[in-house]
């Protein structure tokens, strides 16, 4: 039902034109739920999973000729929003999370744990956790090795990407045009990185591909539906636009990766959670470039169990 065709994640039957669609996020806040949906469809291809309480895959396939793809598109869009609502009820520990701010990495981790436990052999022994990372230096190299080890074992990994408030594109509007001036743009391009997007690293055997090579991973990018290999260890300017495989963002700020179920997951305390919400609420009105997940990485915040 879901497979990679021509570097796109396609969902549906491929026997006739108009039956399959490229799985993409339905709006600017659903990159997280779309990654989760992609993981579920790829890990359980034979499962007769009712995507909603109203419509199953079999019912979608019985649509009028030429309308099957449109039917699937509507079905998957509704499912993304359902996943998001379920995640955000307890987005930060016991606290709810507003839809306008996307989804938190901890709720994504919980959902990934559930998906893997039900869709992969021995998945119940794995629990997904959030780990904030620095995407450069020897420590990042070791992190990439860990990511690739999970992928080689058939387990997907979610990457949290982002960048500064404004990306330095070297395209500055003329003075007096009402746009951000060159000095302000340069200053904003040097601000701390903000988490903006989720992408899904895919096990290569799951998508019928060979190992992409040392340091590389196949990444599903939900805004375009593309699946391409990227060298995660390649140097990237943290102030400029990043590769399309990372959604155009230059930084990897966190990884949501499987570990032994006996390991505990760190959750933000209530005071830190409220600081996170308050700080991000202030940022929303100042975000110049479009983003998906609009919560802040806050790499310096302390987390505890």
Spans of model-derived segments:
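Predominantly the structural core of cysteine protease catalytic domains
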Residues: 87-204, 264, 268
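Active-site signature of cysteine proteases
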Residues: 150-152, 162-305
């Amino acid at each position: 039902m879901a497979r990679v065709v021509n570097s796109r994640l396609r969902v549906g039957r491929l026997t006739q034109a108009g039956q399959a669609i490229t799985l993409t996020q339905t709006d600017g806040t659903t990159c997280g739920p779309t990654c989760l949906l992609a993981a579920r469809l790829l890990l359980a291809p034979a499962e007769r999973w009712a995507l909603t309480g109203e419509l199953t895959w079999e019912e979608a396939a019985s649509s009028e000729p030429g309308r099957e793809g449109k039917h699937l598109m509507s079905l998957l869009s509704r499912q993304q929003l359902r996943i998001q609502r379920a995640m955000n009820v307890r987005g930060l520990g016991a606290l709810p999370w507003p839809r306008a701010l996307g989804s938190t990495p901890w709720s994504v981790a919980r959902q990934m744990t559930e998906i893997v436990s039900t869709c992969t052999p021995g998945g119940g022994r794995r629990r997904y956790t959030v780990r904030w990372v620095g995407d450069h230096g020897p420590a990042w190299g070791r992190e990439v090795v860990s990511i690739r080890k999970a992928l080689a074992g058939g387990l997907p990994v979610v990457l949290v990407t982002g960048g500064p408030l404004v990306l330095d594109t070297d395209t500055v509007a003329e003075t007096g045009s009402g746009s951000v001036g060159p000095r302000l743009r340069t200053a904003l391009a040097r601000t701390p990185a903000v988490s903006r997007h989720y992408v899904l690293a895919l096990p290569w055997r799951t998508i019928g591909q060979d190992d992409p090579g040392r340091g590389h991973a196949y990444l599903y990018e939900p805004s375009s539906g593309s699946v391409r290999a990227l060298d995660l260890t390649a140097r990237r300017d943290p102030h400029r636009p990043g590769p399309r495989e990372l959604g155009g963002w230059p930084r990897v700020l966190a990884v949501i990766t499987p570990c032994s179920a006996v390991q505990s997951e760190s959750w933000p305390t209530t005071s830190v959670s409220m600081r996170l919400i308050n700080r991000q609420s202030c940022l929303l009105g100042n975000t110049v470039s479009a983003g998906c997940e609009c919560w802040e990485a806050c790499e310096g915040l302390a987390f505890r169990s």
